[in-house]
Amino acid sequence: MTDTLFDRADIDALLAGRHPDPFACLGPHRHDDQIVVRALLPGAERVRALSPDGAELGTLACVDRAGCFAGTIAHDGGAPHYLLSIDWPDAHQVTDDAYAFGTLLDEAALARFSAGDPEAVLDCLGATPVRIDDTDGVRFAVWAPSAQRVSVVGDFNAWDGRRHPMRLRRPSGVWELFVPGIGAGERYKYELCAADGRVLPHKADPCARATEAPPRTASVVADVAALHAFAWHDDGWMHARPRHDDRYRVPWSIYEVHPESWQRIPEQMDRSATWDELAERLIPYVKGMGFTHVEFMPIAEYPFGGSWGYQPLAQFAPSARFGPVEGFARFVDRAHAAGIGVLVDWVPAHFPNDAHGLAQFDGSALYEHADPREGMHPDWNTCVFNVGRTEVSAFLVASALAWARRYHVDGIRVDAVASMLYRDYSRKEGEWVPNVYGGRENLESVAFLRRLNDTLHGDAAPAGVVTVAEESTAWPGVTAPTADGGLGFDFKWNMGWMHDTLAYLHEDPIHRRYHHDRMTFGLVYAFSERFVLPLSHDEVVHGKGSLVAKMPGDAWQRLATLRAYFGFMWAHPGKKLLFMGSEFAQWSEFAHDATPHWDLLDAPAHRGVQRLVRDLNRAYAAEPALHALDCHAAGFAWLIGDDRDNSVFAFARRDDTGRLVVAVCNFTPVPRAGYRLGLPAPGHWRELMNTDAASYGGANAGNDGAVWAEAVPAHGEAWSASLRLPPLATLWLTPA
């Protein structure tokens, strides 16, 4: 009798892990006036069906010793509700039957997913604790259209891919399953059988909200209800975030942080700080230093620490290196309470080819391009996202939305935009595929980036989310509105300014006169985009040397040059970004597995540089002339741009009410007495900043705090003053 309850072909297909529709045979099925229940439970010794009150409804006989059970159960004619009582060799389990539940995801939502709606990604995919018909469990859903079979595996089924094969929802390619009796905290992955029959390595969930801490690679069921119920206290901050044009008129001074190494815990095997520990230490530090924002290098889970986070595999999950995901929410909430914005680096260009990740996810090129001329990045040996695929584009946009919604981040810095925009980026002839018009522009990436920015600046995201592009070429309109043909970013990193100015400062002062244009060229295009001036981690690694180590001369000259450069940068048009350790002139390069050399602050010279950065930040934020027109030519005027023999530069910054700050920089170690400088207003001018002040580690040369502009024309101005320019120093002057 039992043999007739379970078809042999179904048994063989289930045991081989290749059944096309496990719900067609497993679970309860009506045959005439009987209810037949079939179960696949490899390793079970005895299986019975019980009513919810514990009464026995029937025994499921073993029809195959590999773990197939079947039997009829008593019923009252209605929909059967039963529990499975399972005797394992070393345990007893009573659970609902995963195959007694109907379809989970709404057809309309799946259609929206197939149409590329990021909201459907957030609504449908991943692991979500839910209650169905008074039964608690977890709904799993994953996109794998080319897979022959997908199973969810975890501690709850001994990682056995035969135990929980999923239901395919055609035509979306989404597989779903409700596993009763489990909840938040469960570890899981997916086991996929490719179309050609290969069983792939277990895959982490692309839409997981939480993960194990590396080097372990499982996804973790997040407590979604707890995240939704998180008690945010930042309503005032969120409502006050600058909108549209206002965000370009406010000060932005960004402290870039590698959270894994900012302050390790040496007493505990040099582990990384948790989010709560970072909140205790980093937020007061950033606040005290006068920075307006902290920007984290990528924090979406990444397997290899040496990638610094730029090869993520869980685009929705804060790295478990820093504790539970709620810890990041607490960090952001506390940062906002302190008046500090939080930006995160976000990586949509590429992903690593780790076996448990996105590469060949369902046995096909699902997230990446199939053609290696498009799908592999030659510099990083990583896979390139196929953003021209509707579902992949939606997946990435949903990730950005999730960071903005779930964690209240104030903005994202999009990594490696240049590599996305050009099909021949870092490729030789014959190694790339032209676009449909025969050109090198990646039209799919352009469309994706425009969509990303329109989404984050639209009603789908909290108001005030900012997007920043790391884009190193002259692609036009990176920060122009998408309606005008631009990409729609709020800001773009000014890589050209950074490279030119650092190259100038690397020269011996006696030779700088021959490279004078490197310091002035940035103003030729300074207002063609809205720029951030980045002194980032990329400039202090891979043998490039730290900022202070790039400067020539002895230690005093190097520190003085760096101070002068900071004075130049903070007065220059553009928002500011400085990488951790640079604010106190660390001598060594960035090392991801080592903490910055905080002990240098025992030395007065390094404390002085740190104090200077603090004071620059405070003055920059307090003086509208230095930030209100950062993105407008009306906010800048050269006073001296051609004194190459003396390596002196001077310029005026102003706001739209007429407030003025004049910066004058001397990039030689020669003090210059009686240096006449044209000024745009007469009378008393005070020294707002002198990077040679003794409190900053300088020699205290200068003008005793003030100069007088007399009616002596100079540099196109009707008034001028005679200045003493300290060596390797920058002065800021403002009308008294």
Swiss-Prot record:
GO biological process, one term: glycogen biosynthetic process
Entry's EC annotation: 2.4.1.18
GO molecular function per UniProt: 1,4-alpha-glucan branching enzyme activity; cation binding; hydrolase activity, hydrolyzing O-glycosyl compounds
Source organism: Burkholderia orbicola (strain AU 1054)
Protein name as catalogued: 1,4-alpha-glucan branching enzyme GlgB
UniProt record similarity statement: Belongs to the glycosyl hydrolase 13 family. GlgB subfamily.
Pathway(s) it belongs to: Glycan biosynthesis; glycogen biosynthesis
Coiled-coil stretches: none
Function (record text): Catalyzes the formation of the alpha-1,6-glucosidic linkages in glycogen by scission of a 1,4-alpha-linked oligosaccharide from growing alpha-1,4-glucan chains and the subsequent attachment of the oligosaccharide to the alpha-1,6 position.
Disulfide bridges in this chain: none
Keyword Signal appears in the UniProt entry: no
Reactions catalysed: Transfers a segment of a (1->4)-alpha-D-glucan chain to a primary hydroxy group in a similar glucan chain
Keywords: Carbohydrate metabolism, Glycogen biosynthesis, Glycogen metabolism, Glycosyltransferase, Transferase
